[in-house]
Every structure is written in structure tokens, then in C-alpha cells.
Amino acid sequence: MTMVYANIFLAFTTSLMGLLMYRSHLMSSLLCLEGMMLSLFVMMTVTILNNHFTLASMAPIILLVFAACEAALGLSLLVMVSNTYGTDYVQNLNLLQC
């Protein structure tokens, strides 16, 4: 494993740990998800370029489109929750509360 792959894997792992540990605010969760998607995009692009997969060259662009859609939906959810509840705490999103 080269240093490029190790750094990208470390970025993905750091974003995943941030998502699992700091779940109090919705904005921090969205930032961690964006970090994970960005590291997956870079890993997929580097792998395709190193292995000369010409048939899979559209896959990183498709992943980037899905990441942009996920970011737009996440930001709209953040605006809706902050307008409704006044904060962006994740515990306010629990549907089982009375």
C-alpha cells in the first residue's frame, strides 16, 4: 500500500470516526459524511488512473453527483430542522419522543 492510499484511507477512517463519535450536531455529521465521500472519490479516481480502467472512468463522476445530491438534501434538512426546533441537535430528530 503506497502512501497515497494510506493517506486516503486515513482520511476516510478519520471521517468515519468523527461521524460515529460526534453525533450531537447535524452539521458535524454532514461534514463527516462529506469527508467520507470526498475520500472515496479520490480513492476511486487514483485506483482507476493507476490500473488504467478505461471502462470505469465515469464512476468517480457518478459518485460525485450522488455526493452533491446528498449534500443538498442534508443542507435542506439542516435548514428545516433549525427553523422548526431552533437548534441543529440530532437528539431533536428522535421520532420516538413524546
Swiss-Prot record:
The chain crosses the membrane at residues 1-21, 29-49, 61-81. The keyword Membrane applies. Gene3D superfamilies: 1.10.287.3510. Pfam families: Oxidored_q2. GO terms for biological process: ATP synthesis coupled electron transport. It catalyses: a ubiquinone + NADH + 5 H(+)(in) = a ubiquinol + NAD(+) + 4 H(+)(out). Keywords: Electron transport, Membrane, Mitochondrion, Mitochondrion inner membrane, NAD, Respiratory chain, Translocase, Transmembrane, Transmembrane helix, Transport, Ubiquinone. Belongs to the complex I subunit 4L family. Core subunit of the mitochondrial membrane respiratory chain NADH dehydrogenase (Complex I) which catalyzes electron transfer from NADH through the respiratory chain, using ubiquinone as an electron acceptor. Part of the enzyme membrane arm which is embedded in the lipid bilayer and involved in proton translocation. This is NADH-ubiquinone oxidoreductase chain 4L. It comes from Neomonachus schauinslandi (Hawaiian monk seal). The gene is MT-ND4L.
